[in-house]
Amino acid sequence: LGFGGGLLALSLWRRGFPVRAAHRVIAKRYAFLALMGAVHMVLLFWGDIMFFYGVAGIVIAFLLRKRDSTLLLIAYILFALCALGGVVAFISGALDPLGVVATEGIGTIESYPNLLLSQLVTLGSQVLATPIILLMYLPVMLAGFVWARQGVLADVPSHRPTLLRWVALAVVITVVIGALWSLSTLGVIAQRWANAANNANSFLGVFTGPGILAGLALVLQPIQERLSAGAPLPAVLWPFAALGKRSMSGYVGQSILFFCLVHPFTLNFGHDLGAFGQAALAFAVWLVTLIFACVLEAFDRRGPFE
């Protein structure tokens, strides 16, 4: 979303928008995203991310005049604070022999009115915690914003070292946290390591976002070069491009599908499935959104939330 904000800023600049007008346009769009996130959080899914992305986007809207070096300095300072928080959280979890990842209460609310009340309380707590949570979301969006302004993904060869460093960082975080969490959950190592990994992931997980984007840019560079030369989009990538154009509809659509499937007051399905079964269920839900996006693409229609 930070990358998208950067592209929007470039588009406004090319069209001759004054800086103040660009501030208003970008802030307005991200304010609407935050509003959609708040509604999504209360009505469907307490784990919404659009609200915080929207708030972070509003902050970025008023940093348009800042140089890329200044924005990156702010991002790296915030990343450093996130890393410090992750280390402290990891140590805290590892030192607690009784620590567990509390998931038992998720998905057990018996009625929709009670769910609405619970998620309204969640929204209130999230609003109060916004300054702290922005510590994790803002640096990722700032990095994406600068990448868009610098054309990082449009000129992968020139920025390959930067992209490779982000990929390496994402791989290390994913492997270390994932290994500790899974081994602890399987009973191979003490349960406290799952709690430690969960704590660390709350802070360090944001580092994997730029790494995933960087990895995709590196892998798809040859295809991007052919597209730039006028070649058609490969058929195998067409469905993913269709969903990418409708990413918000896909995101909210997954919440709607899971809402219908898993709550005790809906179909109450999936609670007894093992890890593989739940992964298969998640894949099936994603596949439905992919097919829906393909249908919309075939008829040249935007997603309902775009």
Language model region names:
Residues 1-50:
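Membrane helical hairpin/interfacial module
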Residues 42-59, 70-76:
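Hydrophobic alpha-helical membrane segments of integral membrane proteins
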